[in-house]
Amino acid sequence: MEKIQRICSLVLLAAFWGCVPVLHAQSFDKLWKQVEQAQEKSLPQTVIKLTDEIFRKGEREKNTPQMLKAYMCRNTYQNILTPDSFYVNLKGLEQWALHEQNPVSRAVLNSLVASIYANYADNNRWELRNRTSLNLGETALPADIREWSANLFVNQVIKYTGEALKDSTELLKTSSRTYIPFVILGDASEYYHHEMYHLLASRAIDALQKVSWFDTDSLVKKDIMGIYGQMINTYRKMPDREDAAVLTMLDYMAWRNREGDVLLRPRAVKEGESEAPNQYLRALDRIIKDYGKRDVCAEAYLAKARYYRNMRKYPEAVSYTHLRAH
């Protein structure tokens, strides 16, 4: 869907509690500058050494964001030098998430774990498709994920995305601004009041979509619909989140259309009707009716224009583009 640039691009997820003293921030900045120089010179061992130093410094000073950034950067270079370290680092991240006490920090960690499992499954899609499903409980999982079947990855992604969004109240109260520079605020971030709930919900949907290819029981699709539904209901109930509600509804409808869902299926023409009613267009019209005075509603007009263009109804497409321009 060609829409407003996505809200927050997560460079390295981290949790940031309170304000870090300027002296500490400068010290971390100096260390990260050295990391950048080592990266430019292709010195992975130096990067690992420096990020380990940053991690330990963050641990001493209880600076969670610096710990997370250093942890993820160090892991990346360890994985390059020693591929098997990927599996050890994943377990370490899971343990960190399990024992983290701060609810938002825990949500961030669970989101990271979910994405790692989803990316691994997506990158090994062909091999996993040819494996027989293993019906195993959580306690019976093989220690080596290289022995897992596709359904086990699906289960883990469902588990960790659920954990990431469990404390939605805290996420709604936490601004993604406090995560800068680990979160880059996109052009549309202000529409969501820069809160962490939408960021982690979007990441959860992305992770679930990556394993939807293996979902034979529609559990993933059900979870995605549930996340969208919860987001829409949440934003509709909040008096200052009309824009967030509009954008989330449009995202939801776009996803359902990509899934070939009922919204775009041809329906029987009733007697006296010139063409079959279309639920997708009706939904867009409802958004325009309810939120037409808001600037963000231009996205609904553009969605209608794209729909008519795809149906090769060019006069209608042009008319809605014209309406949007005004």
Identify the residue ranges that each predicted region occupies.
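Start-of-helix signal in alpha-solenoid helical-repeat scaffolds, especially tetratricopeptide repeats
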Residues: 28, 48, 64, 68, ...
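Structural register within alpha-helical repeat arrays
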Residues: 34, 74, 113, 204, ...
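Conserved small/polar residues in nucleotide/adenosyl-binding loops
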Residues: 321-326
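N-terminal leader/linker segments that initiate helical-solenoid repeat arrays
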Residues: 25-50, 64-65
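Short coil/linker segments at helix-helix boundaries
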Residues: 80-100, 120-187, 210-222, 258-282
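Bacterial Sec-dependent N-terminal signal peptides
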Residues: 1-28
